[in-house]
Amino acid sequence: MSLSSPTSACSSSRCYSSGLSFPIGFGSNPINVGLVCYPKRYSIAARKFVVACSSSSSDPLLVKAAKGQAISRPPAWMMRQAGRYMAVYQKLAKKHPSFRERSENTDLIVEISLQPWQAFRPDGVIIFSDILTPLPAFGVPFDIEEVKGPVIQSPIRTEEDMKRLHPIDFEKLQFVGDSLKILRREVGEHAAVLGFVGAPWTIATYIVEGGTTRTYTVIKNMCHTAPDVLRALLSHLTKAITEYVVYQVEHGAHCIQIFDSWGGQLTPEMWERWSKPYIEEIIHAVKKRCPDTPIVFYINGNGGLLERMKGTGADVIGLDWTVDMADGRRRLGSEVSVQGNVDPAYLFSPLPALTEEIERVVKCAGPKGHILNLGHGVLVGTPEEAVAHFFETARNLDYQTLFQNHVPAEKAEPELVV
């Protein structure tokens, strides 16, 4: 079976540079039928979307939404859509109990990634992986213990520790590239293949703390006691993650999501200093090399950071479920697309309540530039019936029907006609 590379969205021919340098030696109310909470600027676009939908572009629906193009319905996928809530995954995990094996073996990665695609037909198929997967490729070995989770035996906290790091070695990540190629071929243009990375700050929390933590006291203290070392680490991570993003795109990813999972643990001012500049650098570099690849940016607990997140240059801002979608749209404006943000707990609710919440979120997001998703990952124990209903509801949505009663006459705003 050939693993020939799909058409690259990147302007560079190859992205395997080994010459990386670094500073040192690396609960909702039922819908009111009359409710309209999308911003007024979308009203004409809602009525005019039919014209743009005749475009000959071969981009999957999710990519079009990420780019803010007019489409007929919101595309849908779920964070953690492949995983422990699915019976087929549980059966496979019994045969292959090591998470590292499941996420670092091409055959298993492809099989697990395709499980929700085969069951529910989402509009996005995300590679089954982990934000820590690339760490050994640049000098940070780690283990995953059943109770403690990821464990890094030798944290990086000093200038001497930094010498253990090296440029990212893609020979150690071939399983990622091969898996993306196969996924791209398997789903064709029927769905977008999504790759993902962790943001430098979030990855650094594991490397500095030595694993997961509830307090982040060690790395937060480093901001004041060893800022040069922390900056050097973040700079090294930024270069490695940039190359890893481009590697994923060149091997088939239509779209990339950046997870700053623990960025919300910082004050807005500290996030502006210790996370945002490095994310901006990644996005700027990727946009130069892969200008047609949309980048989604998500922070858990991002209600106080939306405007700052927009400033990174990401194409799509993911909202967690604690953010009101209408308020998020108002604060972000029409220049970026949004993703989200159904509360994952709604998947445990009666199906009619789930339907109402999906419709409410879609109405608040407006008829353009919205990727329907949860506000966080799928929870363990989520009924598969509810996941199936989520995607079926999304497929049956139609912007023209949802917004037809709320579009003012063209004469009211002729300057907005496109």
Swiss-Prot record:
Pathway, per record: Porphyrin-containing compound metabolism; protoporphyrin-IX biosynthesis; coproporphyrinogen-III from 5-aminolevulinate: step 4/4; Porphyrin-containing compound metabolism; chlorophyll biosynthesis
Record-linked InterPro entries: UROD/MetE-like_sf, Uroporphyrinogen_deCO2ase_HemE, Uroporphyrinogen_deCOase
Protein name (record): Uroporphyrinogen decarboxylase 1, chloroplastic
Q: Where is this site: Transition state stabilizer?
A: D130
Cross-referenced CDD domains: URO-D
Q: Where in the cell is it found?
A: Plastid, Chloroplast
Question: Which keywords describe this protein according to UniProt?
Answer: Chlorophyll biosynthesis, Chloroplast, Decarboxylase, Lyase, Plastid, Porphyrin biosynthesis, Transit peptide
**Residues spanning the membrane:** none
**SUPFAM superfamilies assigned to the protein according to its UniProt record, in alphabetical order:** UROD/MetE-like
Q: Hey, which family's this protein in? A: Belongs to the uroporphyrinogen decarboxylase family.
GO CC annotation: what is one? chloroplast
What reactions does this protein catalyze? uroporphyrinogen III + 4 H(+) = coproporphyrinogen III + 4 CO2
Transit peptide residue numbers: 1-53
Highest taxon of the lineage: Eukaryota
Q: What is its EC number?
A: 4.1.1.37
Induction record: Up-regulated by light. Not regulated by circadian rhythm.
Residues annotated as binding substrate are R80, Q81, A82, G83, R84, F99, S129, D130, Y206, S261, H376
Q: Which GO terms describe its molecular function?
A: uroporphyrinogen decarboxylase activity
Q: What is its main location?
A: plastid
Question: Could you tell me the gene encoding this protein?
Answer: HEME1
Q: Name one GO biological process term.
A: protoporphyrinogen IX biosynthetic process
As for what it does, the entry says:
Catalyzes the decarboxylation of four acetate groups of uroporphyrinogen-III to yield coproporphyrinogen-III.
